[in-house]
UniProtKB/Swiss-Prot annotation:
Substrate binds at D36, D37, F38, F39, Y55, D56, R129, Y134, Q135. Monomer. Mg(2+) binds at T17, D36. It comes from Homo sapiens. GO terms for molecular function: ATP binding; metal ion binding; nicotinate riboside kinase activity; ribosylnicotinamide kinase activity; ribosylnicotinate kinase activity. GO terms for cellular component: cytoplasm; cytosol. This is Nicotinamide riboside kinase 1.
Amino acid sequence: MKTFIIGISGVTNSGKTTLAKNLQKHLPNCSVISQDDFFKPESEIETDKNGFLQYDVLEALNMEKMMSAISCWMESARHSVVSTDQESAEEIPILIIEGFLLFNYKPLDTIWNRSYFLTIPYEECKRRRSTRVYQPPDSPGYFDGHVWPMYLKYRQEMQDITWEVVYLDGTKSEEDLFLQVYEDLIQELAKQKCLQVTA
């Protein structure tokens, strides 16, 4: 069974989770995996020379466990073809993976059917981050000393990506972002269904 996998990445507090949840509500046969669910325990997080916990790096995440969750979803999607409803039987299983470090993790490179990256300016990102409660809480200087520099490093690494990434303006309203991505996905899914019929 054909599947359709969407990546939604971007800077911290850019609206990735909100967008993923809104899409899940409106796309048939859709599941979401959130990278934030795969952080290692605080005791396993490295500290840099400034004393900042290194949460904004791949090493802070249990990516093997996340890959296992993706594989389980793909396996169950292949076996979920049994349906008495003709229309749902034709629906392509959709998986949205959302997280801040998706597109520079090589094992994921080949799975994306559509990739989106949310951006917001430094000041807006810092403002949004200051309104959120984190466990453990951000220490003074953490955003400027660790979070933003790691985002800039990640953006630089994305220059080497060989597939298409759609960049989104995270300062747009929740509704505008949803509509932009939803309309794009409906077109992409229609193409996939045509390919499925002709295959």
